[in-house]
Amino acid sequence: MSCIFCKIVKGDIPCVKLAETALSLAFLDIAPTSKGHALVIPKEHAAKMHELSDESCADILPLVKKVTKAIGPENYNVLQNNGRIAHQFVDHVHFHIIPKPNEEYGLGVGWPSYPISPEEIKALGEEISSKIK
């Protein structure tokens, strides 16, 4: 097993644990972008969010909420990346809780606008909603 997060779940690699459920684990990031930067991971290994079981999905977000409240930031980002070009560097689903105390620390995000017409948005919405089961 080469997944660093699976090794943390097993206890093979230490972490500064913040909280744990039967299905999820929260701990401090060892290379934080701000004070209190934490990770919440499912104990189940899944590389991308859409591969995660419904049980793990249902378990993890309440833990993200509890950890965020405990960290106590007024401003923060909750980030979950899937795939290399989306900036995922560990192939195990994980949520970053990143406090944003000021302009210097925390996550800086650019948000480029995608050119799409209202008609294209409507057609895309219909296409996507038809695939949701």
Swiss-Prot record:
Enzyme Commission number(s) of this protein: 3.-.-.-
UniProt-listed Pfam families: HIT
Superkingdom assignment: Eukaryota
Cofactor: Mg(2+)
Residues annotated as the enzyme's active site: 94
GO molecular function: adenosine 5'-monophosphoramidase activity; nucleotide binding
Keywords recorded for this protein, A-Z: Hydrolase, Magnesium, Nucleotide-binding, Nucleus
Catalyzed reactions per annotation: adenosine 5'-phosphoramidate + H2O = AMP + NH4(+)
Gene Ontology biological process terms, A to Z: nucleotide metabolic process
InterPro entries noted in UniProt: HINT, Histidine_triad_CS, Histidine_triad_HIT, HIT-like, HIT-like_sf
HIT domain mapped to chain residues: 4-107
Record motif Histidine triad motif, residues: 92-96
Predominant subcellular localization, coarse grouping: nucleus
GO CC term (a single one): nucleus
Residues bound to AMP: 29-30, 81, 87-89, 94-96
Cellular localization per UniProt: Nucleus
Subunit record text: Homodimer.
Annotated function: Hydrolyzes adenosine 5'-monophosphoramidate substrates such as AMP-morpholidate, AMP-N-alanine methyl ester, AMP-alpha-acetyl lysine methyl ester and AMP-NH2.
PANTHER family: ADENOSINE 5'-MONOPHOSPHORAMIDASE HNT1, HIT FAMILY PROTEIN 1
Similarity comment text for this entry: Belongs to the HINT family.
Protein name, entry field: Adenosine 5'-monophosphoramidase hnt1
Source organism of this protein record: Schizosaccharomyces pombe (strain 972 / ATCC 24843) (Fission yeast)
